[in-house]
A protein has these predicted regions:
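N-terminal cap/leader regions of alpha/beta-hydrolase-fold enzymes
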Residues: 1-255
Length: 255
């Protein structure tokens, strides 16, 4: 598991940061309904973000994260990747996600991101001027791949993504798709994450360099996998810098 079931983003609510947040059911291009959670910024900065969860799907962690983005002026929507196998019903933190992970496919994932981006670009979603994706672990891999999706993104962000080699879902490796990328990349890792060695990070950087893609790679030497968690008090400074890096990449200052 990427996070414990009680994990939450390491970002306290902003006092007085009123936002409009809601549960949604969106439809992919093939008609598949999937759950989502959206939050609109009261004071928009022109940025919008599609949030791609880790293997847990649309966990409360990501609902909280949409609100933290909105408080920072970023219209946000988090999607659940399991609409095709688990339906669009709202689920709790104890959801048994494992049977659904292997049923993911790249085309379906891309279609769902496209539907979420279309919602954000609508009047209901806030119609931001520039769009990003951000993902965590498995969602990080999917987020990086959106740089080749043709969605007209301003950038993609991956936190502790596996960027090279095969994946049990069959999703392609971002490094292998780098020559198709069409926007900047921000990739962030824990240096103490044994699951993503330096060789994997370096290979992705090399692929991006070879493709001429603007990119920023941030490695926090002592941070583990899934360090961006309120419970990880030892990594509070790292989490604070991560948030600053994310907002800077989106062209806005820290809230």
């Amino acid at each position: 598991m990427c996070f414990p079931t009680d994990a939450r983003p390491p970002l306290p609510p902003i006092q007085g940061g009123a936002i409009d947040a809601r549960d949604l059911t969106l439809a992919s291009v093939d008609g598949t309904a999937f759950a989502a959670y959206a939050a609109r910024a009261e004071q928009p900065t022109g940025a919008g973000v599609v949030i791609l969860p880790d293997v847990r799907g649309l966990h409360p962690y990501y609902e909280d994260l949409t609100m933290r983005f909105a408080e920072a002026g970023v219209d946000a929507v988090a999607l659940d990747p399991y609409g095709r196998s688990a339906g669009a019903e709202k689920r709790d933190a104890e959801f048994e996600y494992e049977p659904h992970v292997l049923q993911l496919d790249g085309d379906g994932a891309n279609d769902d991101v496209g539907a979420a981006a279309a919602y954000l670009r609508s009047a209901d979603g806030g119609a931001p001027e520039r769009m990003y994706t951000i993902g965590f672990c498995l969602g990080g891999r999917i987020s990086l791949l959106q740089a080749a999706s043709g969605l007209g993104l301003a950038g993609v962000i991956g936190l502790y993504p596996w960027p090279v080699g095969p994946h049990r879902t069959g999703l392609p490796a971002p490094a292998d798709e780098a020559r198709r990328f069409a926007c900047p990349v921000l990739a962030m890792y824990g240096g103490a994450d044994a699951g993503i060695p330096a060789e994997a990070r370096d290979a992705f950087d090399k692929a991006l360099d070879g493709a001429g893609i603007e990119h920023r790679t941030v490695v926090y030497p002592d941070a583990p996998h899934s360090y961006f968690d309120r419970k990880a008090a030892d990594h509070a400074d790292v989490s604070a810098d991560t948030w600053r890096q994310i907002l800077d990449f989106m062209g806005i200052g820290s809230a």
